Amino acid sequence: MNETRNVLETREKYRSRMNSALGAGIVLGAVGLLAGTLLDRDPLVVLGVGVYWLGVLGYVGIKWRAPVEVRDEREARINREAAELTLDVLAALLIVAAPGLTVLTVTGAWTVPEFYWGMVTMLAVVAMIVGAANWYTERKRS
Amino acid sequence: MNNDLPERRDERGMSQADLAAAVGVSRQTINAIERDRYDPSLELAFDLAAEFDCRIEDMFDPN
């Protein structure tokens, strides 16, 4: 009982540290960006972004070094299902947008702005990353 | 999956939080299992069975 209670307390402690690191990164990053913009000091903007990245790195680092899983199994499953749903939506967008924009361009019906091609390219990159991640995970589990 | 977790917990006078602490998951996870909103992993099912000193199939009914 004490051991499992320790798991919960450790999980809470590390989650709190992760959130603090990320929260501090976001707040200080925004302050730096705002101060840099208002005072017209580029170094402050760069510093703000640096602090923000440090916060994100802190979040990931603390999660990585945590001696217990920072999410319990139900929370991990919620995360997996949400990620799966997100990928389904992105896949649907890619399936509809890529051929649709191609047809519009080829027929000359609409000159598709670069922005939309950029989005389709990004969706294609995400699809490739998902494929590679699936391949890697499949290998790990087989 | 149907289960008699609430009854077993009540018999012991345990709250959801007590049981959660005993098996190392969140109280919300115990609540979700009891309400048949989440099926526990095999590992957690074994931990729950051990906590109540019974077999998994005594506690969970897949039908």
Language model features with spans:
Chain B
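Recognition helix of helix-turn-helix/homeodomain-like DNA-binding domains
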Residues: 25-38
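DNA major-groove recognition helix of helix-turn-helix/homeodomain DNA-binding modules
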Residues: 43-58
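Short amphipathic recognition helices of helix-turn-helix/homeodomain-type DNA-binding modules
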Residues: 59-63
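Short basic helix-loop element that most often maps to the first helix and adjoining turn
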Residues: 3-22
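Residues in the helix-turn-helix
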Residues: 18, 29, 58
